[in-house]
């Protein structure tokens, strides 16, 4: 079985440094943070959260899961991510998503939600150029500039790894054209293998070498000895986060039950091709640290 990397989501905005240190001490390969400008409750900003985590750690990689790419101008995001990569001594991974499930945040940012895909594709082109070239000129639909050099450029060469999130075919094509990895969420093992094949086909059609492409997975976990309690907590946490009823579908999209149950379910994803597993916590707030420990010590070693 191929080795799998594991990441832990930083769940609280108030104890980021402590949680990041804990994840690093438990052997996680990544800590990760997502973002929204607004959502169904309080939500972080990915880059600020990861900057705090960077200052509290020395080894663990820092992944955005994800930055909402179309809500940034490419120059601003290129600058922020480059500085974060330099400040963290080359540990940043940029996961991007196009969003759209909460249109109000697009309205508030003055970005037409229907442009999110085209804006994201162009932004990826611009950011990669700014990360890797000097005296850059670009003329596109949304960005136009001449003679721009980003300083500093990222520590990682040729640039920080790019991960594309999303379940639609357009996201798979975006991953094939621009990214180093793919991170779907709310996905089943049955869907996974075929999607990886589709990404590689898109890459082949574009003439892009994807031999080092990394299929990832963003998944929720609720680890309790009692399987019913674990499922109930997963449904409650996901329902609160996404403002919908997860009572009948939490089991499809979360690892839940005791560590053995979680290993069994995760193996289905790994057998389907997942090689980087990023775990977010769908449990009681007071149980997050214990869940993080159980996944690190009793689930992850089976796939290392």
Give residue ranges: language-model regions:
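N-terminal beta1-alpha1-beta2 module of alpha/beta enzyme domains
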Residues: 1-56, 61, 157-160, 282-285
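C-terminal amphipathic alpha-helical "assembly" element
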Residues: 1-26, 93, 111-114, 128, ...
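Flexible, glycine-rich active-site loops centered on histidine and acidic residues
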Residues: 2-11, 71-137, 185-186, 190-194, ...
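Short, well-ordered coil/turn segments that N-cap beta-strands
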Residues: 2-6, 28-30, 57-62, 87-92, ...
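Acidic (Asp/Glu)-rich catalytic clusters
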Residues: 21-25, 50-59, 81, 85-91, ...
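Alpha-helix-loop-beta-strand connector modules within alpha/beta enzyme cores
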Residues: 44-64, 119-126, 130, 293-304
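Structural motif corresponding to the early beta-alpha repeats
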Residues: 61-74
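Short, glycine/polar-rich helix-capping loops at beta-to-alpha or helix-loop-helix junctions
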Residues: 168-173
């Amino acid at each position: 079985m191929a080795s799998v990397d594991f990441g832990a989501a930083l769940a609280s905005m108030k104890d980021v440094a402590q949680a990041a240190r804990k994840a690093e001490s438990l052997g996680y390969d990544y800590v990760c943070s997502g973002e929204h400008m607004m959502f169904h409750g309080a939500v972080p900003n990915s880059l600020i959260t990861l900057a705090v985590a960077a200052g509290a750690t020395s080894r663990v990689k820092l992944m955005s899961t994800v930055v909402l790419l179309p809500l940034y101008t490419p120059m601003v995001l290129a600058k922020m991510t480059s500085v974060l990569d330099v400040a963290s001594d080359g540990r940043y991974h940029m996961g991007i998503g196009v969003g759209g499930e909460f249109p109000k945040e697009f309205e508030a940012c003055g970005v037409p939600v229907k442009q999110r895909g085209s804006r994201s594709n162009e932004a990826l082109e611009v950011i990669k150029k700014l990360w890797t070239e000097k005296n850059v000129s670009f003329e596109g639909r949304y960005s136009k500039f001449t003679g721009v050099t980003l300083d500093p450029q990222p520590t990682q060469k040729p640039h920080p790894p790019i991960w594309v999130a999303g379940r639609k075919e357009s996201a798979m094509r975006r991953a094939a054209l621009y990214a180093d990895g793919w991170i779907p969420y709310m996905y089943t093992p049955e869907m996974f293998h075929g999607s990886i094949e589709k990404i590689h086909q898109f890459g082949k059609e574009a003439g892009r070498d994807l031999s080092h492409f990394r299929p990832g997975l963003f998944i929720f976990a609720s680890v309790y000895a009692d399987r019913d309690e674990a499922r109930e907590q997963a449904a409650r946490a996901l329902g609160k986060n996404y403002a919908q009823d997860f009572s009948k579908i939490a089991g499809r999209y979360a690892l839940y039950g005791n560590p053995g149950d979680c290993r069994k379910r995760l193996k289905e994803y790994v057998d389907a091709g997942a090689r980087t597993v990023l775990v977010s916590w769908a449990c009681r707030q007071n149980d997050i640290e214990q869940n993080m420990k159980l996944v690190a010590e009793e689930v992850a070693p089976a796939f290392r």
